[in-house]
From Swiss-Prot:
Belongs to the NifW family. Homotrimer; associates with NifD. Disulfide bonds: none annotated. It comes from the Bacteria. One of its GO terms (biological process) is nitrogen fixation. Coiled coil: none annotated. The keyword Nucleus does not apply. Keywords: Nitrogen fixation. This is Nitrogenase-stabilizing/protective protein NifW. The keyword DNA repair does not apply. May protect the nitrogenase Fe-Mo protein from oxidative damage. It holds the Pfam family NifW. InterPro entries: NifW.
C-alpha cells in the first residue's frame, strides 16, 4: 500500500464528501473534474464498493480495495460522461430522438446523439 497505513474503518465511515474521500485515500484529483462530476463519481464508487459488502479480508485490505474503487470511479469520469454512464434516472432515458440526424439539442451541445431530454427534434 502506498498510502497512510494509519487509516481505519471508523475514519472511513465519518467521511462526508468527495474531497474527504480523496484526502483520506491520499489520491490526487483535479478539482474541476470533481466539481462537475462529484455525485456521479460517488455513485460509481458506491457501485464498486458493493461487492466488498461481504469482504473477508482484513480492514487494511478492505480499505485498499476501497481506495482502488475510488480511483477507478474517478478515472471513469476522465474519459466518460454522466450521460454515457447513466448512473442516475435522469440519464437512463437520455438520448437523442434522432440519433442519426441529430436534433436541436445535439446541434446546440455539439455532441450529436447526446442531447438533453425534452428538446424537440
Amino acid at each position: 500500500m502506498s498510502w497512510n497505513h494509519n487509516r481505519r474503518w471508523k475514519d472511513f465511515q465519518a467521511l462526508v464528501n468527495a474531497e474527504d474521500y480523496f484526502a483520506f485515500f491520499e489520491l490526487p484529483y483535479d478539482p474541476r473534474v470533481v466539481n462537475v462530476n462529484r455525485l456521479h463519481i460517488l455513485r460509481k464508487f458506491a457501485q464498486y464498493l458493493a461487492p466488498l459488502e461481504h469482504f473477508q479480508g482484513s480492514e487494511e485490505e478492505w480499505l485498499e480495495q476501497a481506495r482502488q474503487a475510488l480511483e477507478k470511479a474517478y478515472q471513469t469520469f476522465l474519459t466518460s460522461t454522466p450521460q454515457q454512464e447513466k448512473l442516475f434516472r435522469v440519464f437512463q432515458d437520455y438520448g437523442c430522438p434522432d440519433p442519426v440526424g441529430g436534433c436541436a439539442g445535439c446541434s446546440s451541445s455539439g455532441e450529436r446523439g447526446e442531447c438533453s431530454p425534452g428538446i424537440p427534434a
